[in-house]
Amino acid sequence: GTLLLRFPIFYNSGKVVPFIDSLFTTVSAICVTGLSTVDMSVYTDAGFFVIMLLIEAGGLGLVSFFTIYLMFASKKISLLNRNIIKDYFTEDSQIEVRQIIKLIVCLTFGFQLIGGTVLAIFLKAHGEENFIFYGLFLAVSAFCNAGFAPYSDSLAQFAHSPEIYLVI
């Protein structure tokens, strides 16, 4: 991610992102902290795509890790709680890691697609030209709890648009 964000195609012309800032943005995206040492509007849509993929990888990694951890930790919890966890994830109580990961990925993408679609509709109503991509970017960022936004003012421009905040 760091090296990709260093290529001129990923940031706006006339603006150079120092290596340390590219590294910080990459780590922040993967760790889903949402911190940035640069104005996020410095990145192009291609740059936001890279950042979105990093957020997605970090978010899916965290959710998958904790789900698998709960599966194995359930061996140390009561029989009732173990059965609740098993029943929650599969009907036949035969938990397999691959099935759980597949379920997590499908649900994650499904929720993000729904959120992105709704956000795109609202962003279009607000005159955003790139409403589809920015809707998806915001949905991924919100779902993974990353807190990144593709605007220089974060989401302040939508301060009087509760519909956008409700979706996020």
Residue spans of the language-model regions?
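Membrane-proximal intracellular helices of multi-pass ion channels
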Residues: 1-168
